[in-house]
Amino acid sequence: MRGARGAWDFLCVLLLLLLLGVQTGSSQPSVSPGEPSLPSIHPAKSELIVSVGDELRLSCTDPGFVKWTFETLGQLNENTHNEWITEKAEAGHTGNYTCTNRDGLSRSIYVFVRDPAKLFLVDLPLYGKEGNDTLVRCPLTDPEVTNYSLRGCEGKPLPKDLTFVADPKAGITIRNVKREYHRLCLHCSADQKGRTVLSKKFTLKVRAAIRAVPVVSVSKTSSLLKEGEAFSVMCFIKDVSSFVDSMWIKENSQQTNAQTQSNSWHHGDFNFERQEKLIISSARVNDSGVFMCYANNTFGSANVTTTLEVVDKGFINIFPMMSTTIFVNDGENVDLIVEYEAYPKPEHQQWIYMNRTFTDKWEDYPKSDNESNIRYVSELHLTRLKGNEGGTYTFQVSNSDVNSSVTFNVYVNTKPEILTHESLTNGMLQCVVAGFPEPAVDWYFCPGAEQRCSVPIGPMDVQMQNSSLSPSGKLVVQSSIDYSAFKHNGTVECRAYNNVGRSSAFFNFAFKGNSKEQIHPHTLFTPLLIGFVIAAGMMCIIVMILTYKYLQKPMYEVQWKVVEEINGNNYVYIDPTQLPYDHKWEFPRNRLSFGKTLGAGAFGKVVEATAYGLIKSDAAMTVAVKMLKPSAHLTEREALMSELKVLSYLGNHMNIVNLLGACTVGGPTLVITEYCCYGDLLNFLRRKRDSFICSKQEDHGEVALYKNLLHSKESSCSDSTNEYMDMKPGVSYVVPTKADKRRSARIGSYIERDVTPAIMEDDELALDLEDLLSFSYQVAKGMAFLASKNCIHRDLAARNILLTHGRITKICDFGLARDIKNDSNYVVKGNARLPVKWMAPESIFNCVYTFESDVWSYGIFLWELFSLGSSPYPGMPVDSKFYKMIKEGFRMLSPEHAPAEMYDIMKTCWDADPLKRPTFKQIVQLIEKQISDSTNHIYSNLANCSPNPERPVVDHSVRINSVGSSASSTQPLLVHEDV
């Protein structure tokens, strides 16, 4: 039927053409055709819905030729028949059908093929350009659904700023695509018959908008080569996408045998990098020139250049940085500096003086760290030049191709030195004088044996005078006169002088009969003069010995320093003598009952005492009293008073030895502090070595109790020398469990006489890792408190940590009560004895004491702690080798019982850069992670419930202003040359 219809159409068209031909040939006037008309489509609708599997039939009517076009998801299908027939429609037949006639006029109808199993037509992948709109091609096959929109994958929300417009025929258009949408996963979504249907997953890939030119750089901006050497340079091109072009270009279009290699990759989504490598395997002189790396994108272009210079052979060019003729005064320093260019690299450099090569005092280094650097600097440091050290100083440098040198003439301004003065056989007196500038020589005569002549001898009598230059740069002058004309006894003076100074020599003559002989100068000295010189020399020696012995005496100085101001590494300390003292701290002397001496030093001592009514009116309390010895001087008395003021300024803290009172009137100054019965931590650790339990166990149950009772060895505070408190015999003691041992002290170590004796027992408990962690934690807390008060300790070590009931540690400063003269830990340096092995490098070499240097000392303390009281840097004496190893970064290995985390803290405390060391507050936080919850809880309870004694409290909310300030008087331990 379709074929018959087509034949009928063909006959109609043929008949029409014949009729037109007849009309054209006749004499009838022609009739112009009407306006073109649109073809008509049946069914005459803009949209048509067809169910899947049904027949799709569309017809197009037009007087002329027509063509059907079907478009869906960007694909086109054509048909030149009047009808478009699809016997079984599918979802994929959804789309726009257009009929076009020969005049180009057309009509369209959009067909939906409803398919319950396929609601969306999906076209993948999904691309978008930043700043533009992009279409998610997911047109519907059923226009009657609702809530047609976008959804994020897996229930994730879409970006808040994402907006879109939905079109069932085309899909969903995302407006103004942003770079942040890259790799956004989404679905097209619609509600169909009460349920939500999702399309396949779309992943949006965003192409970044190019808003800047590429970033271009090269590995080196200049290169110098000899002929035959290989040359390569890398160009780095960075852009947001790979749509960038790049190339190497030689300027001025010069020919070259260069080759290029290219590599590129993406670093993330919008970070594209390309490397263009320029290679010349064997450079020639005509390869010299400027090479440009050029890159461009749609925004613009960028370029960078590198210069290649190829020489036929190597070279060395020396540039003195000063005049080669130098004048310097005797005793002054001078630096001879040259810069030089060398290619290939210099192989040998040296400074030479008087045929002697310097092995030190000079340094040679490149002008820059650039790989293509060819400029170097050499410096010779001449210190405290003497008159005989002038002369020629030569710098020599060589490489594989050439040698070169430069010479400096150094003249040292020195006063004249009379080298020889003698009577010649020809009747002449001669003076040979050396100095710079050139000395002048005058001759004088006077009768008798004098030491100074004033009558000049006329220049006409000077027979000879000439000069020459010595190798050391001095000018040597020879001057002679004829002494035959002298008729009387007398003295001839040869006097040489220049603008630096003068010198003289004497000739003495006496006549014996008719002969004349010279009297040598030594005959002029009388026994009286000799005796005077000997006596004066002995007096000088005695004064020097007494001065030396006085300087060797240890000078007492308060170690704790309160910082007033910090300017970089310059710390301004508050002068402790200017700190206020509140007389409410005063305590009656007659209420103190003194006991045994706990410790003594060169100037002072600490004595155990009982204070009556210090805390309560009817209570006795054991305290420690620091006082001066009768041999102490005014300096020590002022220092003890300063220590008292510093303690009162700081206030109370659980982990420092707190001030309880003082006696400053009516007698010698007494400083009353807390009493710590177990002595210093260093000796405590050494006593507990044999009972140390290596494993860290929890503080509960029978295991902990059994562990504490394993060690039955009796030990008391009197077992070791120089420690606190002999426990009284005849008292029954109770060994507490580990859970009890930190509760055994009344708060803050304020122990009263009426406390049960069971609380006053010596610490017989074993020592374990949890104890060591607790000690390190408490000391860090105490140091953090001192730092918060702007206080620097300067002598933090286990020997300066005291231990009291409950194993509470307290930081102290023994000061004048420590015998540092006989303590091997303190090394004599300058006018002080210093704990060198505990000191930070900046304190050793530059005399800089800061909060950071205290942190270094804390790291050494940790090493002592976890080695159970071993001396740091074992087996290593404090000598030049020790200083050198500290400078070179030598650090101790982890002690035997230190956990890895604690050794990490030690290493950070020992960082060569003070600013990279942790603060004490940070150290406290680090150690809190290591200690058990029970230990932390016990410590917190003690700290929270610890009462302050009823003594005055200084308000620290406002910094105390010092009338004067004093820096440390300690000298630097080691100058650079000593290492």
Curated annotation (Swiss-Prot):
The modification Phosphoserine is found at S744, S749, S824, S894, S962. Disulfide bonds join C60-C99, C138-C188, C153-C185, C235-C293, C431-C494. Residues 549-979 are cytoplasmic. ATP binds at residues 599-606, 626, 674-680, 799. Keywords: ATP-binding, Cell membrane, Disulfide bond, Glycoprotein, Immunoglobulin domain, Kinase, Magnesium, Membrane, Metal-binding, Nucleotide-binding, Phosphoprotein, Proto-oncogene, Receptor, Repeat, Signal, Transferase, Transmembrane, Transmembrane helix, Tyrosine-protein kinase, Ubl conjugation. Its EC number is 2.7.10.1. GO terms for molecular function: ATP binding; cytokine binding; growth factor binding; metal ion binding; protease binding; protein homodimerization activity; SH2 domain binding; stem cell factor receptor activity. Residues 1-27 form the signal peptide. Ubiquitinated by SOCS6. KIT is rapidly ubiquitinated after autophosphorylation induced by KITLG/SCF binding, leading to internalization and degradation. Autophosphorylated on tyrosine residues. KITLG/SCF binding promotes autophosphorylation. Phosphorylated tyrosine residues are important for interaction with specific binding partners. Residues 29-114, 123-207, 214-311, 320-413, 416-510 form the Ig-like C2-type domain. InterPro entries: Ig-like_dom, Ig-like_dom_sf, Ig-like_fold, Ig_sub, Ig_sub2, Immunoglobulin_dom, Kinase-like_dom_sf, Prot_kinase_dom. GO terms for biological process: actin cytoskeleton organization; B cell differentiation; cell chemotaxis; cell migration; cytokine-mediated signaling pathway; detection of mechanical stimulus involved in sensory perception of sound; digestive tract development; ectopic germ cell programmed cell death. Its main location: membrane. It catalyses: L-tyrosyl-[protein] + ATP = O-phospho-L-tyrosyl-[protein] + ADP + H(+). The chain crosses the membrane at residues 528-548. PROSITE patterns: IG_LIKE, PROTEIN_KINASE_ATP, PROTEIN_KINASE_DOM, PROTEIN_KINASE_TYR, RECEPTOR_TYR_KIN_III. Present in an inactive conformation in the absence of bound ligand. KITLG/SCF binding leads to dimerization and activation by autophosphorylation on tyrosine residues. Activity is down-regulated by PRKCA-mediated phosphorylation on serine residues. It is a single-pass type I membrane protein. The modification Phosphotyrosine is found at Y550, Y556, Y571, Y573, Y706, Y724, Y733, Y826, Y903, Y939. Residues 571-573 are annotated as: Important for interaction with phosphotyrosine-binding proteins. Belongs to the protein kinase superfamily. Tyr protein kinase family. CSF-1/PDGF receptor subfamily. Numerous proteins are phosphorylated in response to KIT signaling, but it is not evident to determine which are directly phosphorylated by KIT under in vivo conditions. Tyrosine-protein kinase that acts as a cell-surface receptor for the cytokine KITLG/SCF and plays an essential role in the regulation of cell survival and proliferation, hematopoiesis, stem cell maintenance, gametogenesis, mast cell development, migration and function, and in melanogenesis. In response to KITLG/SCF binding, KIT can activate several signaling pathways. Phosphorylates PIK3R1, PLCG1, SH2B2/APS and CBL. Activates the AKT1 signaling pathway by phosphorylation of PIK3R1, the regulatory subunit of phosphatidylinositol 3-kinase. Monomer in the absence of bound KITLG/SCF. Homodimer in the presence of bound KITLG/SCF, forming a heterotetramer with two KITLG/SCF molecules. Interacts (via phosphorylated tyrosine residues) with the adapter proteins GRB2 and GRB7 (via SH2 domain), and SH2B2/APS. Interacts (via C-terminus) with MPDZ (via the tenth PDZ domain). Interacts (via phosphorylated tyrosine residues) with PIK3R1 and PIK3 catalytic subunit. Interacts (via phosphorylated tyrosine) with CRK (isoform Crk-II), FYN, SHC1 and MATK/CHK (via SH2 domain). Interacts with LYN and FES/FPS. This is Mast/stem cell growth factor receptor Kit. It comes from Canis lupus familiaris. The gene is KIT.
